[in-house]
Amino acid sequence: MYSNFKEQAIEYVKQAVHEDNAGNYNKAFPLYMNALEYFKTHLKYEKNPKIREAITQKFTEYLRRAEEIRAVLDEGGSGPGSNGDAAVATRPKTKPKDGEGGGKDGEDPEQSKLRAGLNSAIVREKPNIKWSDVAGLESAKQALQEAVILPVKFPQFFTGKRRPWRAFLLYGPPGTGKSYLAKAVATEADSTFFSVSSSDLVSKWMGESEKLVSNLFEMARESAPSIIFVDEIDSLCGTRGEGNESEASRRIKTELLVQMQGVGHNDEKVLVLAATNTPYALDQAIRRRFDKRIYIPLPEAKARQHMFKVHLGDTPHNLTEPDFEYLGQKTEGFSGSDVSVCVKDVLFEPVRKTQDAMFFFKSPDGTWMPCGPRHPGAIQTTMQDLATKGLAEKIIPPPITRTDFEKVLARQRPTVSKSDLDVHERFTQEFGEEG
């Protein structure tokens, strides 16, 4: 029932703004006051804090405008026929728009609030991950380029029945680079990139979650060409009919199905990109909405070799090409995440050596580096002793060696099991394709 107060308030606002714009201030003032009374009554019953905040903001705006009009009327101005110049002078630079509560282009306060929350999902700064940083996955990269890069740079390619792909599902074991690939897409694509998770789209308020989904796709269409990346989509779109499925969850899935169907059949330049570790958990109707279902497997030896180089970056090391080949062969069964963790651990090995060292030598440039007792110029001292002498800034850890990697690999194990791989390979045979 309390929603009637809000609707009545909005109706009065529309009339008030209309009269205000026409300069009929003696008519606009009572209409503003009526709107304020209805908004005040609505606020007593409104439980949603976001909506309360939005209405309070508009209430303050209309109250300020009503006070300005009252001041004009007190001076004898009632509209264009009486002291119109004075009335114009008192107008605020931005008056309320003739719409539902004064939001953008007639948006009501609730929709404005939903969109404000989704704005944080837009990736404003490029993640700075290039295609070349993604090791392997050539088929997946080619398919994504066909869907993302070519339609923007070469729109003339897509004529007649040739249309770019509209929905991609990336699936595979954890840590294989699905989200990393999405970051590369965000970097390389000249498109608006929306990165969302279930927490961005699920609300505790009844009916708000599906509105968030609807607004997300609407914003993507307005910003086209655009990409919507949904990470861990299985948490949003599990199989329907399960015992633990709530009514809210069902409505989110239904809205997502409707929106994706719309994206697929209209040339709106909106690409949906989703990732999951559990493809079998997806609802079959959602699964069907994805044109391309690409398996992101564990990296091969060559890809792992490339990953070691990328993660080491410009950190000082003395590894040769045969050393990197050895590491690629040695890490069979490792995911991209496993390789990343391995390198992070290795990066600290020189620091550990420096902390434990009993001998240091002074290089020609004045820096001190740990060494063995037989190294030319070796001096028996410790890192703490050098720091006490004011040489802390001159201490440099040694470059990374193959031995450092062997030491770390001796204690690290892959995180993906054989049974995990079997599940994804079976799904690929039934529904997907190799990446």
Swiss-Prot record:
It holds the Pfam family Vps4_C. This is Protein SUPPRESSOR OF K(+) TRANSPORT GROWTH DEFECT 1. Residues 95-113 have a biased composition (Basic and acidic residues). Changing K178A: Loss of ATP binding and ATPase activity. Pale seeds, transparent testa phenotype caused by a lack of proanthocyanidin (PA) and mucilage defect in seed coat. The gene is SKD1. Mostly expressed in leaves, to a lower extent in seeds, and barely in roots and flowers (at protein level). Particularly expressed in trichomes. The lineage of its organism: Eukaryota, Viridiplantae, Streptophyta, Embryophyta, Tracheophyta. Its EC number is 3.6.4.6. Monomer or homodimer (in nucleotide-free form). Decamer, dodecamer or tetradecamer of two stacked respective homooligomeric rings (when bound to ATP); the dodecameric form seems to be predominant. Interacts with members of the ESCRT-III subcomplex such as LIP5, VPS60-1, VPS2.1, VPS20.1, VPS20.2, VPS24-1, VPS32.1, VPS32.2, CHMP1A and VPS24. Binds to PROS/At4g24370. It comes from Arabidopsis thaliana. InterPro entries: AAA+_ATPase, ATPase_AAA_core, ATPase_AAA_CS, MIT_dom, MIT_dom_sf, MT-severing_AAA_ATPase, P-loop_NTPase, Spast_Vps4_C. Changing L63A: Impaired PROS/At4g24370 interaction. Induction: By Pseudomonas syringae pv. tomato strain DC3000 (PstDC3000). It is an enzyme of class 3 (hydrolase).
